[in-house]
Amino acid sequence: MTDHTTRSLNPELTRRRFIQGSTLAGFSAFLVACGTSGTGTPSAPASSAPSTEPGGSPSEAPSAVPQSPSAELNFANWPLYIDTDDDDETKHKTLEDFTAKYGTVVKYSEIINDNEEFFGTIRPALDAGQDAGWDLVVLTDFMAARLIRLGWVETFDLANMPNKTANLQDVYKGVDFDPTDDHHAPWQSGMTGLGYDSAVTGNLTSLDALWTNDPKWAGKVTFLTEMRDAIGLTLLKLGKDPSAATQADADEAIAEIQKAVDAGIVRGFTGNEYAEDLVSGNVVLAMAWSGDVIVKQAEKESLVWQLPDEGGMLWTDNMLIPKGAAHKYTAELFIDFVYDPAIAAQIAAWVNYVTPVKGAKEVLAADDPELAESPLIFPSDEVLAKVKIFKSLTEEEESYFNDKFSAVTGN
C-alpha cells in the first residue's frame, strides 16, 4: 500500500482484485461466525499516527515505562506474509509506518518456510540460554506451544500492549498452551486445502486429486512439509477427524501418503516454495495455504485455492519474543502496533489471511465493502464447519507422528 494508514486503504491494490474473485466469495464474516464483536477498542488516546477509521485506534505505549524503542528490530517471518509494495518487494508499508512512529528500523527477513526447519536454527542458542538473534518470530500454534513449554519465550509486559489486550478477538483468548495470553500474540490464521493451476487441471474440488495419477499433473504435485497439514488433509481424505487423530490414524495416513509417493504423483514435500512453483509451472497441484495462492494470482490468474469437499485444516501463526531477545520492549511495541485495527486491515488486505484483530473488518468495510466480505479473511459458518484444527499432541505423540512423517518425506 502506498497511502498512510490514516487515509483510506488503496483501492487499486492488486491483491484486492484477486481476492474478490475467490471461489469462496460471498460468505459471511468470521466475527459473526464466532459470535464475537467486530469493533476494535482503543485503550488510550491516539498517538502520533492515529487511525480515523471506525473500529478502533492505536494507543500510546504506557508513559510510565522508562524505556525507549531500540534502533533496530530483528523480525523473522514467512514469505508473502506482510503488506508489500506492488512495485518494490523490499518495501512494506506497515514496517515503514512503525519506523515513522518509533524511529526503529525493522530488519525483516522472510526466512521461515517450515516450523521444524526454523526451530532447528534457533534451538542451539536457546538451549544454551543465549540470544537466538531474533527479537520477534512468527510460528504456528503447535510450535508456539513447544517453545512456551520449553521456557524459550519471553513473558509479555502487557502494560506495553493496550491494543493487543483490547483488540484480540475472543475466539483466540485463553488457548491451552498460553491461558494467560502473555507469551504469544496471533499474527494471522489460515486454511490448508488445494492450490492448483486451473488452466492445466480444470476445476478440482476433492482431495482425491492429490492421489490421482492423471498425466496432466502426475509428477507435478507437492505435499506440505508441515506434518499436521499433510497428515490432517490425508485423514480428511480417509474420512477421519484430525482433531481426534490417534497413532493408528497416523499410521494409516502415512501409508496413504506413501502410495502417492510410490506412484510418482508427488514431486516433493515443500514449505512456501510451492507458491513460486505454481507460478512457474513446475507444480500444477499442491497442498496449499489459502493466502499464498491468492497472492500469487496476481502473477498467474489461473491459480485457484479450493477448500476441498472433504474439508480443510485451520491453523494460527503467532508472534513470539524468543528468550533473551535483545530488543524485547521494542518487540512488544511492534506487536501492539499491528493490533491497531487500521494496521491489521492494511496487512490483511494484502496477505488475505484471517486477521485476529477486532475492528479490522470495519476498517476494510469503510473502504471496500466487497473485500470486507472475503471468506478468506472473514470465513463464514459454512466454511468454519468444514475445517479442522489438528489435535494438541503430547510429547510422546508428537515424537511418534514426526518420526513416521519423516520416514516418508525423507527429512
Spans of model-derived segments:
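Early extracytoplasmic/lumenal segment of secretory-pathway proteins
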Residues: 64-141
